[in-house]
Amino acid sequence: MNTKTTLISQAQLEDQFAYCDKIAALWQQEGRIPSAYVETYGCQQNEADSEKLRGYLTQSGYTIIQQAEGADVVVMNTCAIREHAEQRVFGNLGALTHTKRRHPEQKIFLCGCMAGETKVSQRIRQSYPHVDGVFSTHHLWQFPEILYNVLTQKKRQFYVADEPGSIAEGIPQVRDSQLKAWVSIMYGCNNFCTYCIVPYVRGRERSRQPEDILRECRELIAAGCKDITLLGQNVNSYGKDLEGGMDFADLLAAIAQLPGEFLIRFMTSHPRDAGKKLFDTMAAYPKIACQLHLPFQSGSSRVLKAMNRHYDREKYLEAVNYAKSVMPDLVLTSDVIVGFPGETEEEFEETITLIQQVHYDALFTFIFSPRTGTPAASMDDPTPKEEKNRRFDRLCAVQNAISEQIHQTYIGKTLRCLVDGQDKELLTARTEGGRLVRFSGCDSLIGTFQNITITGATTWSLTGDLA
């Protein structure tokens, strides 16, 4: 794997903007406004990438619509983390054959993490002739060029070569929300957990320059953004590849000192790099949300070693205990994998006891999914699927009870919340910790911070009244 970082020059980006202009001119000649649909699978980084795809499409003259039917361009931005996600993509790609029969000039593209897998691009070439283009995450910045070539050359485009990881500043974005924004601070991953395909499809870690991140945050705040989430496969590794010595905690502090009323969140943190400096920084700045997503994956030190996670149960608990000591109101969430190859019943029980000891606000739970090309895919896995399902169901039941118990403790408390939308006759808001709150109020409150007194709670959400 090529480990060098390519910095996309302004001249290279200007070339892409020129392709946008050429595409817009093609449609002007036809005398109509084209439409495009971008379907996103997977993580928040993919959501951020889709905002760039929509930005390029808008600059090329397209109107963004919410369905593939009738769209001149369909882009499927894919996820490769689990087999189920890949099968969904292939199923939906197959369904697009019918859409394309009704609209033969429709152009279909597959991008994202799946596009970085050789087996996927080969399968698309052989079995999905209606797909016009495939490009990996390394080539997202070249999307206008790829689209223009498909439109003018009338032949399929595959931009999937093993390129070095790139960073491109200045790609236009069409964001999903004016109130909330994703800000990528780094790309790729160096951890190589044995079950994870991300380092193979997104490349090695590479950090954006702090001044570029700060400029983007300033622009968002000036435009009215109230909730900024910093993104990276492992945000705690930020800056290790940069000169100047700024690490992630330093970056957080710099953003927290920007003027304006807003909250900062971040994901995802890797426990191996989550130390006291990070937690002390979170505690020191009110603009940094008292919320932490810290995946533990397994409560068994032996399983963690087999996963190549670079920490054990004790080190993880040490980090969590310190974080809670400096942030007593911390909202803590995590990821956990059930049924990793070789996981015994006793090791699964270690996961249960860790959950009960830590008391997470919420968990994102997954049954192990083998990914071709990763070491875990070839590990001996004697545990039957039925047993993995049983463990998964038990874990979810334990966590759901904890989540509801924690939510009940909020009844009677008054929480500062960002009002972000409507749900039927009620307004919706998010607490600093990310909890959903429903309450009665005027539409004019949307986009403001309000104090809400909690009056009811379920496993998944809270209800309340304006204080």
Q: Which residues make up each language-model segment?
A:
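Terminal RNA-binding accessory module
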Residues: M1, S378-A467
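Proteins enriched for Cys/Gly/acidic motifs involved in redox and nucleic-acid/cofactor modification
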Residues: M1-Y238, K277, E314-S325, Q356-Q357, ...
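Conserved, mostly hydrophobic/aromatic
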Residues: C193, I213, L230, F266, ...
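Conserved SAM/AdoMet-binding glycine-rich loop
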Residues: I108-L110, T118-K119, A222-E345, Q356
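Charged helix-capping and loop-helix junction motifs
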Residues: F90-G94, P210, G244-D250, D312, ...
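Short flexible coil/turn linkers enriched for glycine and charged/polar residues
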Residues: D176-L179, C189-N191, I288, S298, ...
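Short glycine-enriched, charge-decorated loop/helix-capping segments at active-site entrances
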Residues: A80-I81, R202-G203, L242-G245, K305-Y311, ...
